[in-house]
Amino acid sequence: MSKFYDSISDNYEDIFQPNEKQINFLEERAKGKILDVACATGKVAKRLQDDGYDVMGIDLEEKFVDKAINENKIDAKCMNMLDIDKLEDNFGLIYCIGNSLVHLDSTEKINEFLKKCYDKLNPNGNLVLQIINFHPFLQVDDDYLGNLPTIKNEKVEFVRKYFRNGDFIRFNTVMTAADKSIENDVNLFPITSDELVKLLEQNGFENIKIYGGFNKAEFDKENSRPLVISAEKL
């Protein structure tokens, strides 16, 4: 397990919980079997499964997959997202959310993933991606690029900051829970909305729509924090 995810694995579900807008957005695009790429502990997949959908999850982190299977009772496999072409099934919806896509470290790898998503989708199937809108960060002429709002509840506080690191962005987190405080860093590949749309088009996707969140807010390149994209294989 990577150091970053190992450090937050025990508190992951305290930090990140599904929300209704997210679930509704996915269910509106669900057509047949669903694949959750980078499913983590499987909370989102479980919500969809509880609503009657046939869902499979994959994640690179074995500890997450164990929780997805044993605690959230979903069909999950420990697998790199670049290996989805090895799955037997095709899908009506593939989604990769939670800024997971940008853990791939190059345009080439992201392009490879999108191509494999296209190949694994049924005709009229949908792909949903959600990452951070990196455009505002890339306009900052400083090593410190900014932060996202702190996640804070009765169980945990999760502080998120971003720093320039060559061609990458260093994602710095501090998680405080009970009697522990853990700081960690991981590099992210800051692909922009324009670059992502271009790759989707090159791989044959159509009906590409960009939003500023799962609430379908209009995407503002300069100000939107999330970037949500849906695309269809016609």
Name every feature range the model reports, one short phrase each:
Residues 85-93:
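A short acidic, Gly/Pro-enriched loop at the edge of an enzyme's catalytic core
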Residues 111-123:
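A short glycine-rich, Lys/Arg-flanked "PGG" loop and its adjoining helix->strand segment in the class I
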Residues 38:
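Conserved S-adenosyl-L-methionine
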Residues 42-84:
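Class I SAM-dependent methyltransferase SAM/SAH-binding core
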Residues 193-234:
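C-terminal lobe and adjacent flexible extensions of AdoMet/dcAdoMet transferase-like proteins
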